């Protein structure tokens, strides 16, 4: 076959392929814009036709789709179609309807499948399977159980303070999110497995850990647009990964560490029993308990335990640590807030009096700081989709068909000026009156709400109350080269990210006057 015959064959073939592609795209556009069951819901036409609209803002513009969604609500109203299949609602009064405690709610595979933890309760799509999976682990995070692990939390705070003492003596600046992530990681792993990761026992702690969870969720977010890309990249080896997407290396290392920990528990259950005798609290640990029940509970497999381990460790570290970071910045950035917090703590706990969780929870100003920190750290800043599997949802006069993913965003709810005036300001007094706190708590959605609410909420509150109180009772801190831009939401990569180039919240420490 000569070149002329090849050209004569390929030329009409390419034109035919091009024509078929054009017809397909036009047909798809007509279908999505006019024939889709969501065609009656307002929104940009391009978003209704293709996920490339979302891809542009979240991947190319690095986590800016949440901000674009806010603009779309200003243009189209409280309900907007943001993709071919998904609706977004920005109305705080609808939150408890969507995130219901009683009505069945499934999760959207678009949100969960790319984290590769399908066996975890967090990633379980169907509500019928989610209920027993959550019920298996929920008792370990109940308020009464968390109250009993105060010695473990206090032990980790003591270790954290030993590290901070070294920084204070040396006059070295501390990047607080590094310290706080190591603290929360050791708490969650010490409680759930008897075998803490030990980051607080490492000199200078483990700086890479504070980035690992962020990298994990960022990769999961990008991977849904590029299925197969990261598994393929992971198979090429460390050198290629370092050149193409180095953040993947820390995620692979984290997963390998989790596999090793779970495999050890699975193959050495007797060691878990021995570890329990030396643990910092007497409460049964979640993962050794699951392993011990595997022989009588078919749903408990090594893969299931691994997926729960990855999810609980990841979810139980960065979000709480980020809230502590936000609290730290705003306390230090406003001398009046620091003065009032110190006065409240010194009044209730004079001298070396022991601070217990139950008493700390009754302190109105400390509570205001914790709640305001949660409000401005958002939990997951990304929208959380829920699906009504059988019944249509009705928002005002708009009917949303069953099996439609519907999302709402804490980053939008927490900045609703009709509920939180001066919403970008850190104002603990919003929460100090107990009746006002009860009213506002309806709109505090950092832990989400409903049947899939964050399972670790009680543990997070305990860590926040105990750690914030202890740190500001003992240390004077001074911000160094840090501004509000270092804690302000600039991009939403599921977790809130500050502006590009931010070095985080850095402080210089010294013992507080009158401190320990």
UniProtKB/Swiss-Prot annotation:
EC number: 1.14.14.-
Location, primary (coarse class): membrane
Consequence of gene loss (knockout): Abolishes the production of ochratoxin A as well as of its intermediates ochratoxin B and ochratoxin beta.
Gene Ontology CC entries for this record: membrane
Induction: Expression is positively regulated by the cluster-specific transcription factor otaR1. Stilbenes such as resveratrol, piceatannol and pterostilbene downregulate the expression of the ochratoxin cluster.
Keyword Heme annotated: yes
Record's description of how this protein is used: Stilbenes such as resveratrol, piceatannol and pterostilbene affect the expression of the OTA cluster to reduce ochratoxin A and B production and thus could be used as naturally safe and efficient compounds in food active packaging or preservatives against ochratoxin A in food. Pterostilbene with methoxy groups demonstrated greater inhibitory and antitoxic activity than resveratrol and piceatannol.
Single GO BP term: ochratoxin A biosynthetic process
Membrane-spanning residues: 13-30
CDD domains for the chain: CYP58-like (cd11062)
Keywords, ordered alphabetically: Heme, Iron, Membrane, Metal-binding, Monooxygenase, Oxidoreductase, Transmembrane, Transmembrane helix
Superkingdom of the organism of origin: Eukaryota
Membrane topology according to the record: Single-pass membrane protein
Pfam families: p450
Binding residues for heme: 454
Pathway in which this enzyme or protein is active: Mycotoxin biosynthesis
Localization of this protein: Membrane
Annotated GO MF terms: heme binding; iron ion binding; monooxygenase activity; oxidoreductase activity; oxidoreductase activity, acting on paired donors, with incorporation or reduction of molecular oxygen
Cofactor: heme
Reaction equation(s) it catalyzes: 7-methylmellein + 3 reduced [NADPH--hemoprotein reductase] + 3 O2 = 7-carboxymellein + 3 oxidized [NADPH--hemoprotein reductase] + 4 H2O + 4 H(+)
Function: Cytochrome P450 monooxygenase; part of the gene cluster that mediates the biosynthesis of ochratoxin A (OTA), a mycotoxin composed of a chlorinated type I polyketide dihydroisocoumarin moiety linked to L-phenylalanine, and demonstrated to have nephrotoxic, immunotoxic, genotoxic, neurotoxic, and teratogenic properties. OtaC catalyzes the oxidation of 7-methylmellein (7-MM) into 7-carboxymellein.
Family designation: Belongs to the cytochrome P450 family.
Protein name: Cytochrome P450 monooxygenase otaC
Organism: Aspergillus carbonarius (strain ITEM 5010)
């Amino acid at each position: 076959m000569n070149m002329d015959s090849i050209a004569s064959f390929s030329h009409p073939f390419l034109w035919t392929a091009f024509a078929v592609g054009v017809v397909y795209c036009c047909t798809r556009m007509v279908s999505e814009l006019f024939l889709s069951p969501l065609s009656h819901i307002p929104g940009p036409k391009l978003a209704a036709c293709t996920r490339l609209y979302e891809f542009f803002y979240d991947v190319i513009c690095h986590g800016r789709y949440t901000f674009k969604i806010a603009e779309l609500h200003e243009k189209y109203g409280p309900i907007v179609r943001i993709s071919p299949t998904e609706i977004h609602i920005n109305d705080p009064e609808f939150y408890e309807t969507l995130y219901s405690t009683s009505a069945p709610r499934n999760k959207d595979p678009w949100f969960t499948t790319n984290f590769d933890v399908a066996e975890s309760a967090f990633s379980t799509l169907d509500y019928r399977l989610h209920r027993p999976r959550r019920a298996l682990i929920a008792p370990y995070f109940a308020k009464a159980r968390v109250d009993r692990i105060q010695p473990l939390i206090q032990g980790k705070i003591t270790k954290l303070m030993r590290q901070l003492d070294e920084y204070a003596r040396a006059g070295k600046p501390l990047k607080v999110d590094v310290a706080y992530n190591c603290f929360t990681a050791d708490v969650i792993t010490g409680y759930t497995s008897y075998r803490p990761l030990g980051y607080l026992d490492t000199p200078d702690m483990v700086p890479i850990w504070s980035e690992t969870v962020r990298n994990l969720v960022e990769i999961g977010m990008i991977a849904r647009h590029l299925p197969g890309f990261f598994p393929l990249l992971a198979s090429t080896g460390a050198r290629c990964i370092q050149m193409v997407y180095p953040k993947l290396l820390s995620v692979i290392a984290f997963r390998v560490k989790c596999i090793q920990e779970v495999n050890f528990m699975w193959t050495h259950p007797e060691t878990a029993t021995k570890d329990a005798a030396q643990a910092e609290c007497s409460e049964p640990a979640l993962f050794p308990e699951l392993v011990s029940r595997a022989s009588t509970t078919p749903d408990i497999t090594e893969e299931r335990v691994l997926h729960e381990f990855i999810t609980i460790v990841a979810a139980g570290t960065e979000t709480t640590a980020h809230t502590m970071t936000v609290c730290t910045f705003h306390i230090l950035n406003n001398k009046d807030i620091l003065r009032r917090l110190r006065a409240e703590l010194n009044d209730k706990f004079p001298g070396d009096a022991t601070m217990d969780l139950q008493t700390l929870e009754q302190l109105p100003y400390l509570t205001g700081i914790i709640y305001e920190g949660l409000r401005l750290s958002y939990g997951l800043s990304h929208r959380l989709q829920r699906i009504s599997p059988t019944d249509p949802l009705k928002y005002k006069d708009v009917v949303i068909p069953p099996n439609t993913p519907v999302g709402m965003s804490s980053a939008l709810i927490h900045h609703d000026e009709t509920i939180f005036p001066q919403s970008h300001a850190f104002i603990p007094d919003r929460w100090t009156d107990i009746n006002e706190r009860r009213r506002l708590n309806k709109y505090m959605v950092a832990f989400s709400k409903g049947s899939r609410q964050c399972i670790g909420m009680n543990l997070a509150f305990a860590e926040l109350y105990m750690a914030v109180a202890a740190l500001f009772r003992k240390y004077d801190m001074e911000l160094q080269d840090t501004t509000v831009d270092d804690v302000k939401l600039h991009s939403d990569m599921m977790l809130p990210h500050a502006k590009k180039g931010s070095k985080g919240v850095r402080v210089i420490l010294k013992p507080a006057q009158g401190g320990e």
